[in-house]
Design a protein with these regions (language model features):
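Short beta-strand element of the alpha/beta-hydrolase
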Residues: 236-247
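Short amphipathic alpha-helix adjacent to the substrate-entry channel of hydrolases
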Residues: 255-273
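Short alpha-helix in the alpha/beta-hydrolase fold that links the catalytic acid
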Residues: 481-491, 502
Length: 591
């Protein structure tokens, strides 16, 4: 039986290996890519700095080594004593890699686990303890060291994972055959980095299973489609609401299903909701700049909404980079001395000040960014599949390696999960826009500088934003650190409200009140320090959505009106929601 397995396994392994080399063109496209060379250069320089400081601080190194050796001996002694399974070190809370009871109860695997965890902790603590390394270099070394350490976790290998070994023996290796088949398919559908499947990509259809709230596309240009949602109440608030999603993701994270759709909930509260659905760019859109998302994006959407509804002002909300675009739009209006067209602005997990980028900062380096720019310019865009893997590796154990083990080594089929489907439905970013984000915003933090960013021929200034603003961030957000978003809020003028939700970048925002799952913190006084603000904040139960809705109602006339007509003479209905742009999947077919 095993002879037959090994024969099949070797055939599939050869097929997968051939596909890998063919699709990735490893020799020339990956190994010799500008980005790979830049990463090697940066890692070499960082390692040299690390060794230099380690050589200059032998006492600190020896102290940690002595502690490691003492604890390692204790692990030896504990596992050598029959029945004594006392744990010297445990996995951190939330780390599910070693949840199988064999890691705790079987001496050999307990030893492997504890030795690995102890080495990992000692190595990272050693880097952290070294003086003389600048903060950015230290953060980068720790980040990439952590990537290597977690990639080499004993949980990722059959021989050192008791659960995998037992499963493979019980199934006569069929799990590995099934896993290789999935690996081959993922290699075929990946870009230059292996994108591990998180969910069944055939389980959902955009417009049928997700993004199902009824509406109509009333405008389309090269950049976006504008969706006008159909009302769910007899009367509606007089001021329409425009939502600006990030152009690095698809909008329907805010309209997954009826039970968790923010769009549907807002309609139920009487808001007239309009949504921008960004195009998934290909090489033909390489020229699209960040400023175009303002002048050809939000500005065009606002004009369309004004004509359709007959209202002179709207409320607007932006999510993540969509919020950055929205803030830039409001500042653009101010710089052009135009009439106030946006009555209030809401920012979900939005960075305006990029001085605290979080773990994304590991990639924010002139050498690395220059290499990415070279690749973007040659290709015309940043491939969304690679971008998706980059974000997954910010939480590598829970968003990458666990799926690697589950899919390829256990041979399990990915589950059907709407949120993970959206997360896997990646979108490209045009070369010009991605280059701008990395260099002008993340690296040089120009958005908060005087005459730092010019859009549509004018310098924009966030301090000129005088409309009421509502900032909501989440405490566990690892993509847009809430301390960083808080700093951005301080750069704007006007009345400001800052709210801190529980959970992370997605779950903390998509937090339907009916679930009563996550609460939030509120403090009406914006202190200079984010931590000081939090120390004086009051925790509230329930979703921040209800608080935001109460805030939005302030910027609506007291009396509601009849629902607005769908489209207008100049903005006729083109298509039913969700439109066509959101259905573009990667790789984008060039027309």
């Amino acid at each position: 039986m095993f002879q037959h397995f090994f024969s099949d396994y070797l055939v599939k392994l050869q097929e997968t290996n051939h596909q890998w080399w063919h699709d990735f063109e490893v020799n020339k496209a990956v190994v010799n890519s500008p980005l790979n060379k830049a990463m090697q250069e940066v890692n070499f320089e960082d390692t040299a700095k690390l060794f230099e400081q380690a050589a200059n601080q032998p006492a600190a190194i020896l102290k940690l080594q002595a502690q490691w050796w003492e604890q390692q001996l204790q692990i030896w002694q504990n596992v050598a004593l029959a029945g004594n399974q006392a744990q010297i070190i445990e996995a951190e809370k939330g780390d599910k890699r070693f949840s199988n009871e064999a890691w705790q109860n079987e001496a050999m695997y307990s030893f492997i686990k504890q030795s690995y965890l102890l080495f990992s902790k000692t190595y990272l603590d050693t880097i952290e303890s070294l003086e003389g390394l600048d903060e950015k270099t230290k953060e980068r070394i720790i980040f990439f060291s952590r990537q290597a350490i977690n990639a080499l976790s004993p949980s990722n290998f059959i021989a050192t994972n008791p659960e995998l070994l037992k499963l493979t023996l019980e199934q006569n290796g069929q799990n590995l055959l099934a896993g290789l088949e999935q690996l081959k398919e993922d290699v075929e559908s990946s870009a230059d980095i292996l994108k591990v499947r998180m969910t069944n990509n055939n389980a959902f259809r955009v417009g049928d299973d997700v993004a199902t709230t009824a509406g109509d596309v009333v405008f389309q240009n090269e950049l976006f489609e504008l969706i006008q949602y159909r009302p769910l109440t007899e009367k509606v608030n007089a001021t329409p609401l425009l939502i600006v999603p990030p152009f690095i993701n698809k909008y329907y994270i805010l309209d997954l299903t009826a039970k968790n759709s923010m769009v549907r909930w807002l309609l139920e509260q009487g808001h007239s909701v309009f949504m921008i659905s960004w195009r998934n760019p290909g090489k033909a859109q390489a020229h699209v700049e960040f400023g175009d998302y303002v002048t050809e994006g939000v500005v065009k959407a606002v004009s369309a909404i004004e004509e359709i509804t007959g209202q002179e002002q709207i409320n607007a909300a932006g999510y993540c980079i969509g919020g950055t675009v929205l803030a830039s739009t409001v500042a653009y209006y101010a710089a052009k001395r135009m009439k106030k067209r946006i009555k209030s602005a809401t920012f979900f997990t939005t960075l305006l000040d990029f001085s605290q980028p979080g773990e994304v900062g590991a990639y924010i380096n002139d050498t690395i960014i220059s290499a990415i720019e070279t690749q973007n310019n040659a290709k015309g865009y940043m491939d969304g599949r690679s971008l998706s893997v980059t974000f997954s590796l910010l939480r590598e154990n829970s968003l990458y390696w666990n799926y690697y083990v589950d899919n390829y080594l256990k041979g399990n089929s990915p589950v059907d999960f709407d949120l993970l489907y959206w997360n896997s439905d990646s979108t490209n970013v045009s070369a010009a826009s991605h280059n701008f984000l990395l260099r002008e915003l993340y690296l040089e933090n120009k958005l908060v500088q005087d005459k730092g960013v010019k859009i549509g021929g004018v310098w924009i200034d966030l301090n000129k934003i005088k409309i009421p603003s509502y900032f909501v961030s989440t405490k566990e957000d690892h993509i847009a650190l809430w301390q960083g978003t808080y700093r951005g809020a301080l750069h704007t003028g006007g009345n400001k409200t800052f709210v801190l939700g529980e959970s992370g970048h997605i779950a903390g925002i998509v937090n339907h009140p009916a679930k009563n799952k996550y609460g939030y913190w509120l403090n009406d006084t914006l202190d200079d320090s984010a931590d000081e603000w939090l120390s004086n904040a009051e925790h509230k139960e329930g979703s921040w959505w209800t608080h935001w809705n109460e805030w939005l109602v302030q910027y609506n006339p007291q009396e509601q009106v009849e629902p607005f007509p769908v489209g207008s003479e100049n903005y006729p209905v083109i298509d039913e929601a969700p439109g066509q742009y959101v259905k573009q999947v990667l790789p984008v077919k060039e027309s």
